């Protein structure tokens, strides 16, 4: 660490100058890797462990981090602090070794809180839309020349990274409610996009507990801070009287402080007007499809307007917005002649949405932008508990596509639950009589089973949060064409 870097550390986080070496367990996750990247750029010695390399670990290695693709006690040797992902169990050998060596073990959000402590923090929370809204706020602040630091849960495509260290006073961060760790954060501004029943194991299956946790998060704001909340969401509307902080509401609702109206989608772009109190109407072109993204943009505009950012900078940022990785991510349009002998093409879109509300929003955006397309979805349910808890909602939403192919549930470490598997879900959907789902038992069969259902005027949505993103990229690489054994062997 050189003198200039050390001086910068002392100016930003005075007490953390005592920390030199920070070790991350589960460093390959987007949220963990983003914080590690910011700290690496601040001059800290970074090490970390994960089970397999990925683009996040490669980026960190490029910055000089030491990455171990195993979990061993010796990996934490000489660390000043160990940061742990919520996905890591307490009996992990590195965690055990850290405790034995009296090395502090903290959660990701605690380290994020330290980064935020001496900056103007803007935290984006909510069940859906956090990642995209974080990217929108970051893009606006960057366009305005404010050079923010950002830490996002997904790839910010314009920057090519999940996180970036800026020289300005702002830190814009996605706040994760999945393990309630966002309660460690003490931002100046907090956005809450919506609140639905998800990650209920964290909240003992009690939705009231989840709602109160969001209130507690907002009460971490100073009395002069501001909560920016989507009034279209019925739970948020219910909670507003309990928020003891200054609030700005946004939404399509007539009583919203920042109101979206005249929404129209043309292809991948949304066009709408934003009405703000004591401001001229703002006519927005947003380079992201769907009414849900208009709401995300309204949240970002509400924050930027409160900060006094120029309207022209806001509009430029939204019109040129490049989106985030795996959020309605266009991977290409491919001719079908080599795939199944038909004329025409198929568009391929990759999307991370894995909750029924998110899947519904993606389908609606696809229908609005490309109403004449044959809509084909390849869906991978994520977690048996989520499939069980939201079973009927999934069955209702998934009947809206023209053709549905379904992979087995991605377990994310969970044990199977009878009746919450993909075969059962396909059977239920089939029984409703609208579509006949196709179960794909082996991911290696996706291209082979997809090809016959394509018509030549298709939009393929590859949907889910497990390893299905890799399948989407693989489909793009082979241009949807099923591979012969010889071609697979060559690959």
UniProtKB/Swiss-Prot annotation:
As recorded in UniProt, its EC number(s) are 6.3.2.8
Q: Name one GO biological process term.
A: cell wall organization
* Enzyme class, broadest EC rank: ligase
Q: Where in the cell is it found?
A: Cytoplasm
Q: Name one GO molecular function term.
A: ATP binding
Q: In which pathway does it act?
A: Cell wall biogenesis; peptidoglycan biosynthesis
Q: Which family does it belong to?
A: Belongs to the MurCDEF family.
Instruction: Briefly state the protein's biological role.
Output: Cell wall formation.
Write down what this protein is called: UDP-N-acetylmuramate--L-alanine ligase
The gene for this chain is murC
